[in-house]
């Protein structure tokens, strides 16, 4: 019985050892922008606005922007970090009252499709949904974040702050802003 246990333990430890990842030997900052100085260089489709006493890129309402980064250099990993403000009536995985208008409010981050690292389109974009909607009884517009679409999580799941001031006004203005 001991030999079997030791054999299983050795097999299990070698499995974990082979699944280890290499250490990151250096960090190189490639792009940084607080937008406070109105700098939109290397950005197409971006506009600036003020929210909560700071300058932000946006509002986008069914649109987006592109950041062009040249001469990134050879790398094994890319770490992307930013503050994402979700304003107004994002309805997550389910949007609209009629069967024809029930399409998700998707948020997509895409990387250059010609990257030689991956040829599978699933690896060069991150697609998820967000919901700022409240839940009432059985009525709850779920979101996918922090998972990929079409996962189902409660509204505002994973938000850093879900009670920031309201930016959008009017009938479809929705609730407060959420920060991710």
Write out the residue ranges for each language-model feature.
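C-terminal motif of bacterial Sec signal peptides marking the signal peptidase cleavage site
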Residues: 15-18
């Amino acid at each position: 019985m001991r030999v079997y246990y030791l054999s299983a333990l050795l097999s299990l430890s070698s499995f974990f050892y082979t699944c280890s990842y290499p250490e990151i030997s250096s960090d190189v900052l490639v792009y940084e922008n607080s937008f406070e100085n109105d700098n939109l260089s290397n950005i197409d489709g971006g506009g600036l606005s003020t929210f909560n006493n700071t300058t932000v890129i946006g509002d986008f309402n069914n649109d987006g922007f592109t950041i062009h980064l040249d001469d990134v250099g050879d790398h094994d990993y890319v770490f992307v970090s930013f503050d994402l403000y979700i304003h107004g009536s994002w309805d997550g995985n389910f949007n609209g009252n009629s069967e024809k208008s029930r399409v998700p409010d998707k948020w997509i981050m895409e990387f250059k499709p010609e990257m030689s690292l991956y040829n599978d389109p699933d690896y060069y974009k991150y697609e998820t949904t967000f919901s700022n909607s409240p839940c009432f009884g059985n009525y709850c517009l779920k979101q996918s974040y922090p998972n990929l679409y079409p996962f189902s999580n409660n509204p505002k799941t994973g938000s850093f702050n879900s009670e920031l001031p309201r930016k959008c006004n009017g009938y479809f203005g929705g609730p407060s802003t959420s920060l991710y």
